[in-house]
């Protein structure tokens, strides 16, 4: 079975060649180079990945772009848009047409102070994404679900992905929980969910990225969320991701795969194939050979 990791980040240890985002002047702990990632992929039998532009570089895509060009058979890219830049749609077009990015990430935490995610800034991003025929990925909290709901109602032809279970927590999937709101948004046929970031979704709430220990694996309290998402969205609208490099110190890269592929019972072989590769290729195109 072909396996594609739909969500991870890479960065270099060389901060002179690849300067850091001034607002994030320190690299997170751990090795996140593309070379180390490839070692992890080969060990786990993962064919390719969607690299999401990391916040450590802000809107400077130099390192990720070099990785995409150097290993085009393994990597596909999702760029990060600057919602404060009035020329952001033009820059998005350049990144897609000249550098080969196949999607764009939107982070409401980067919007101008006091400006809602449900605003004309997002409308312009949606319009450009539809023109370019690319997907939009959202890093959001449950408080932003209503905004994404409204945007998708206005722009129903755009493929949208919500990362990391929408940052819902396994400890509360009751009738009035944010997770139930996420399930209700399945009425948008082009909305997809990344089943990524298992350790952070797991209960009790993680005390920052990477705080869940290896002993917590395989995060069985997250499994009911996965099963409800499959039931409501269908596996064809879900995609698995590790959130490398953070997964490495949370439980190890290979275990970040097997927690779904081997440790989550009741998923049919056909559904598993969609979760592990077919959905992400449906949205982003081919990721090279198996």
What are these regions (language model features)?
Residues 1-124, 128-132, 220, 260:
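Mid-domain alpha/beta scaffold segments of enzyme catalytic cores
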Residues 1-6, 25-48, 227-228, 232-239, ...:
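Mid-to-C-terminal alpha-helical segments outside catalytic/metal-binding sites
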Residues 12-14, 58-61, 113-114, 169-170, ...:
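Short catalytic/ligand-binding loop motif for oxyanion handling, primarily in non-cytosolic enzymes
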Residues 13-19, 62, 90-91, 173-175, ...:
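Short aromatic-enriched loop/helix-cap "lid" or pocket-rim segments at secondary-structure transitions
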Residues 64, 148-151, 256, 260:
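Hydrophobic packing residues within well-ordered alpha-helices of enzyme cores
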């Amino acid at each position: 079975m072909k396996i594609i990791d739909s969500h991870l980040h890479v960065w270099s240890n060389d901060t002179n060649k690849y300067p850091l985002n001034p607002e994030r002047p320190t690299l997170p702990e751990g090795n996140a180079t593309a070379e180390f990632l490839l070692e992890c992929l080969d060990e786990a039998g993962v064919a390719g990945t969607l690299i999401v532009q990391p916040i450590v570089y802000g809107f400077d895509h130099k390192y990720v772009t070099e990785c995409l060009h150097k290993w085009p058979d393994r990597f596909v890219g999702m760029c990060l848009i600057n919602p404060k830049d009035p020329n952001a749609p033009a820059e998005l077009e350049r990144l897609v047409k000249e550098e080969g990015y196949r999607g764009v990430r939107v982070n409401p935490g980067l919007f101008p102070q006091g400006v809602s995610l449900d605003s004309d800034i997002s409308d312009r991003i949606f319009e450009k994404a539809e023109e370019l025929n690319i997907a939009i990925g959202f890093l959001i909290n449950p408080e932003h679900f209503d905004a994404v709901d409204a945007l998708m109602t206005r722009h129903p032809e755009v493929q949208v992905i919500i990362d990391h279970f929408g940052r819902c927590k396994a400890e509360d999937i009751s009738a009035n929980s944010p997770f139930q709101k996420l399930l209700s948004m399945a009425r948008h046929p082009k909305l997809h969910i990344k089943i990524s970031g298992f350790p952070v979704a797991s209960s009790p709430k993680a005390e920052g990225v990477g705080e869940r220990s290896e002993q917590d694996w395989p995060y069985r309290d997250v499994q009911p969320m996965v099963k409800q998402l499959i039931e409501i969205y269908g596996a064809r609208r879900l995609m698995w991701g590790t959130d490398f490099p953070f997964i490495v110190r949370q439980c190890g890269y290979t275990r970040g795969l097997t927690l779904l592929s081997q440790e989550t019972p009741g998923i049919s072989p056909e559904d598993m194939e969609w979760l592990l590769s077919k959905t992400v290729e449906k949205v982003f195109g081919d990721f090279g050979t198996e």
